Amino acid sequence: MKIQSTIRSQARIALLACLFAAGCHAPGPVAPPADGVVLWIGEQRKAVHDGDVSAKVRLAELARRPHLYGIGPLEGLTGEITVVDGRATISTVQGSTFRTHASLDHGAAFFVWTHAADWKSVPLPNSVRTLEQLEAYLPEAARSAGLDDSAPMAFRVEGEVQSLAYHVLSPPEHTPPTFADHEKSKIRSSLAAQTVRMVGFHSTEHRGIFTPGASDVHVHFVTADERFAGHVEGFTLAPGATLLLGVPKR
């Protein structure tokens, strides 16, 4: 019964993601998506510009299926969500203090995710050390791994950063928040010489949907000790970092 319930749940979420993202319709039952396929629900631009910040999906529902990786803002734009292999790290700001805790008992205003057990390691050239350089390199990395570089892609970066700039959303001033509220609620910080795990998603076709309006990537991070997490704004990688690409099952 639990397996059947999980399958029904994943099918329902797949249908919701389809309806939100592609405007499609489903005349019959929807099968759970294959491992490694990137899905999303809600839209960044609607949350940020239109104040549509209600929960579009619950993390616990997505995590019923193993190997969940995903990122997005908390409902209400009150914090950040980073899920690494089913473990959700929630980052918030209380006063001037950054806080993190592990919990699946949250909803996301918009969310992009994959369920992936298979990841392909791709060497990072010495010339790829910053977020901008990684964004430019990802299509080439996908091709070298035999993946479709035109499809939305999940990726991870693991290793040490020499520096990393990030923000965490704090509760906005108004409900629903305005765009000005959203920008003001970004509490920025940075760290150095830390071992991190980053989860990101790349697409050339989804700016303002699950990537920011001026970028083809959306990336979050968690430090190895889980004390810090948030939305990545920039970084400089130390030598030896690893790039992993999610491999969709065919």
Regions found by a protein language model. Name each.
Residues K2-A14:
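Bacterial N-terminal signal peptides that target proteins for export
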Residues G51-A109:
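N-terminal low-complexity or amphipathic/hydrophobic leaders
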Residues P172-T223:
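Short, hydrophobic/π-rich interface segment
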Residues H220-R250:
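C-terminal structured interaction module
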